[in-house]
Amino acid sequence: MEMEEVIAEVLQKIVPTEEERAFVKELIGELEGIAREKAQELGLEVKPYFVGSLAKDTYLAGDHDVDLFLAFPLDTPLEEVRERGLELGKEIGKTLGEYEIAYAEHPYVRAKYRDVKVDLVPCYDVRDWKDVRTAVDRSILHTKWVNENLNGKNNEVRLLKRFLKGIKAYGSEIYVRGFSGYLSEILVIKYGSFVEVLEKADFILRQKVVDPAGWLKREPEIAMKTVRREVEEDKPLVVIDPVDPRRNVAANLSWEKYGRFYFKADEFLQRPSLEFFFPTGKTGGDYLAELRRKGTHLITLLFDVPEMVDDLLFPQLERSARGFEKALSREGFEVLGWNTGRYGAEKAFVMLELDRVERPRVKIHPGPEFFTERGRDFYRKNERVWLVGKRLYAEKRVKENIIDVVRELLEKNQVALGKNLRETVKGAEILVDYVPRPLENEAYLFLSREKEGLKH
């Protein structure tokens, strides 16, 4: 297919219909009315703001998640914003029907209304970046800036978002580390169109710094401080927030996700296809056959997790997986990859691909110099001891089975784990070359590299 044909067909699928737009407009009107009514009942001077893709008209067809921010006056103490904001969110949630409390920088309410997810988030009613008190305050400014600068390129943003979703590079959550919706909007505003953003994938990376609002001229000291900080942390991009020179919009973007965009952008420009937007790749397969093909082994730990949102859980799962990777490497096992996720509502898993599940019965254990106190202690404690020069060496018996090795590492606290997972991981069920049926496809996608691979 020609590129124009591909884009036209994608737009048919992702641009909301008039009927859908009417539903969204009605939904927003109802929610705003409820929010104002409840704020008035509680005697709160709060302004409701709709932010995010719905408020900017950059949402994809069928994606109606609502972000409703409850903005308090700037002179309100932070603790009051948290407490009264949560109280207001609960009252709105009760009216909507069902809700739960979620936690980020401060608690907020997640509700559901007419089959649409609604986040009710307390914030400050900020006018510019100098007013920002909490991380969420900027969202009001983001929505205003995009609406003032998008100039009818809404569908170009939709194309970029759908493309990024299709290549698994969309979402700024800490467990995704991809492109946020706001970053997508900025790139389209800066470079003109979906195709032009793709054409500049290499240029953007080499340029490194994107400054759409000209902060480097307006606030050079603050903006340069942001640039230096992000460059020192080896971030792929520094996109100075158009509404706040202190912030890098691409701060959560990983090298891996930009790398996916880098290659897939070029592939699409060379060979346009719907597959980039709506992939039909494998969703599962035979993980045991994959293990036989590779000659490797799969270790899976299943454990209970405390109740927490994914934004908090997934970084801790990742930290735990990296902890196992380092600890097992020290023990002589080669960890070829790891994978984490939820398993049902109350459990999580860590998968580790290893070169083997057994190791030699003995290991050469280097000791201290023989004429030291530690040397004499080493000589007393070990059976087979010899000298190489002035240094002592011994044969040390080691655990052979991977399960025993993992258990011992956990018992001795030699694995760096997520802070809320330390106790539960110690009681994990450890499976070797086997996973429960609900995780079979997940195991296959991990082992085959279908999940994160660039080429298969």
Curated annotation (Swiss-Prot):
GO biological process: RNA repair; tRNA 3'-terminal CCA addition
Keyword field: ATP-binding, Magnesium, Metal-binding, Nucleotide-binding, Nucleotidyltransferase, RNA repair, RNA-binding, Transferase, tRNA processing
CC cofactor: Mg(2+)
Pfam families according to UniProt: CAA_C, NTP_transf_2, tRNA_NucTransf2
Transmembrane stretches, start-end: none
Sequence positions that bind ATP: S53, K56, H142, K161, Y170
The enzyme's E.C. designation: 2.7.7.72
GO MF, one example: ATP binding
Lineage top rank: taxon: Archaea
Leading EC class: transferase
Positions that bind CTP: S53, K56, H142, K161, Y170
Binding residue positions for Mg(2+): D65, D67, D119
Keyword ATP-binding: yes
Similarity comment: Belongs to the tRNA nucleotidyltransferase/poly(A) polymerase family. Archaeal CCA-adding enzyme subfamily.
Self-association and partners: Homodimer.
Function: Catalyzes the addition and repair of the essential 3'-terminal CCA sequence in tRNAs without using a nucleic acid template. Adds these three nucleotides in the order of C, C, and A to the tRNA nucleotide-73, using CTP and ATP as substrates and producing inorganic pyrophosphate. tRNA 3'-terminal CCA addition is required both for tRNA processing and repair. Also involved in tRNA surveillance by mediating tandem CCA addition to generate a CCACCA at the 3' terminus of unstable tRNAs. While stable tRNAs receive only 3'-terminal CCA, unstable tRNAs are marked with CCACCA and rapidly degraded.
Protein name per UniProt: CCA-adding enzyme
Species per Swiss-Prot/TrEMBL record: Thermococcus kodakarensis (strain ATCC BAA-918 / JCM 12380 / KOD1)
